[in-house]
Amino acid sequence: MDWAPVSQRIWDMKYRFCDPAGAKDEDLQATWKRVARALAEPEKDPEAWAGRFEEALTGFKFLPAGRVIAGAGTGRTVTLFNCFVMGAIGDDMASIFDNVKEAALTMQQGGGIGHDFSTLRPNGAPVRGVGADASGPLSFMDVWDSMCRTIMSAGSRRGAMMATLRCDHPDIEAFVDAKRDPKRLRMFNMSVLVTDAFMQAVKDDADWNLVFGGKTFRTLKARDLWERIMRATYEYAEPGVIFIDRVNRRNNLQYCEQIQATNPCGEQPLPPYGACLLGSINLAVLVK
């Protein structure tokens, strides 16, 4: 196969199977054969399906996601799912660090993760019983970010994370501006959960309350916050915007689940503990 040097390097670094005992994929076709055989194992006629899968891969008609190519048929204890949204983070220290541990183990096995940090009380809010003030969701995002920097996800790639925060959270301005510091939260993609009520307030040039736990912490102009988000996106490409009410309205399972986050790249909204198995269909070779 005639392929570009960069393609060869990516295959060799990220998807080629090699183990300390010396077993390895000799070439790309060996990778396709390994993946096809592994995916065909559950079928009633594995040999027939392995051939069909291998033909699709060899012709680049369909490519499964990277975790499938890297992990299928290797015998390693890794996930074949690329992306997850983790469970809700409780607003207490035990739940926060239980979620950090869960995220670390998920990324160690190859999964990218999404988290909604809107459940954490804002910076300066009192913490009853300990005589202290909360440090806010961004301080704990720094903990996730440091953890992610130390995790080599499934052997050959760094972890990937998405952080979301509601547009009415009292720390939303700090969230929007967080990446003005080029060294901060580099392992995160970040998105604001924008509601229909907020967009209406922007259109009406109305006031917008920043609230948590039923208490209004501050009030600002909705249009000022919207323009702040747009300036940040223009200047350093983040945060993104997720129209979360529309996402939930169009979810076929809206009657039994609530979506508040997406996978790391943002293309797949998921409920808590939801997972997505990704793949690419190459229409260029399927359509004449």
Regions found by a protein language model. Give the residues of each.
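Extended catalytic cores of very large enzyme megasubunits
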Residues: 1-288
